[in-house]
Amino acid sequence: MVREKVRISTRTLQWKCVESRADSKRLYYGRFILSPLMKGQADTIGIAMRRALLGEIEGTCITRAKSKKIPHEFSTITGIQESIHEILMNLKEIVLRSNLYGTHDASICVKGPGCVTAQDIILPPSVEIIDNTQHIASLREPIDLHIGLEIERNRGYCMKPPKNFQDGSYSIDAVFMPVRNANHSVHSYGNGNEKQEILFLEIWTNGSLTPKEALHEASRNLIDLFIPFLHAEEENFHLEKNQHKITLPLFAFHDRLAKLRKNQKEIALKSIFIDQLELAPKIYNCLKRSNIHTLWDLLKNSQEDLMKIEHFRIEDVKHIFGILKIEKHFTINLPKNKF
């Protein structure tokens, strides 16, 4: 049987923007690459990034309109070309950029005739309109239009209850999604066991964020989601004394990792799962039951630790050492002592 050799790439991951353009004030496009990645990693990152880009990034929207002169949403006002429903839909499309939190007030106060556009909205100082030309309404007669607005910052899609309030305010379904679309694709290169991958990310935004800003924010949000796992408390296992236990030298694998460059190789070791080591089924199952899933998990255990695993024998430890004798591919100094 030919054993597949597992190699670790010590090359630092790098990303860059390979294409960037603004098709309009409300449509930005960016294309990015990340490489080199091990087989399977590009899809893992690409799927997570796409979900984070579309669902985890916050946006600012108009969520409510208020006017005492409006009897109901589907009514019309003399002198205004659009129905109230059409005006609400136009307000829904207004693209805003801000760092505010909570609910803030804005307003429209215009005298006709003329066109009402986004530039006629009176906003808080911290809010910016991306496209001042966005149409809201057309006033055909010399009438006064006064609309109170509420602005919120949130994420995802927020469907307001259909109920209208007695004060003449109307809720607006808000799409707090600065990223219009995101796609990823994978390019493989290399031969045989040396295959690596390049991740391509395409991002379209509504102009309130650039694709690069969206990529940074999505990355930070993903990191924040995983940080709790890094601070999880280790469980303390109290093992009963066993008179038949074999006493082994207190050699800890992690003592041999002192020469590694932690920022690169530690991450690489955590990316190699014990599934790739072609272990015997019994050994594999024992390790998995002991929450040893990666090469990094394995190397943190001493020989004595491994012998404490239920149903584990000295021959099993030797078998693991036999597999890890491909040490030159891990650049790790393994023990030379015999059992």
Curated annotation (Swiss-Prot):
Pfam families: RNA_pol_A_bac, RNA_pol_A_CTD, RNA_pol_L. Keywords: Chloroplast, DNA-directed RNA polymerase, Nucleotidyltransferase, Plastid, Transcription, Transferase. One of its GO terms (cellular component) is chloroplast. Its EC number is 2.7.7.6. One of its GO terms (molecular function) is protein dimerization activity. Its main location: plastid. It comes from the Eukaryota. Residues 267-339 are annotated as: Alpha C-terminal domain (alpha-CTD). It is an enzyme of class 2 (transferase). Signal peptide: none annotated. It is found in: Plastid, Chloroplast. Belongs to the RNA polymerase alpha chain family. This is DNA-directed RNA polymerase subunit alpha. It comes from Populus trichocarpa. The lineage of its organism: Eukaryota, Viridiplantae, Streptophyta, Embryophyta, Tracheophyta.
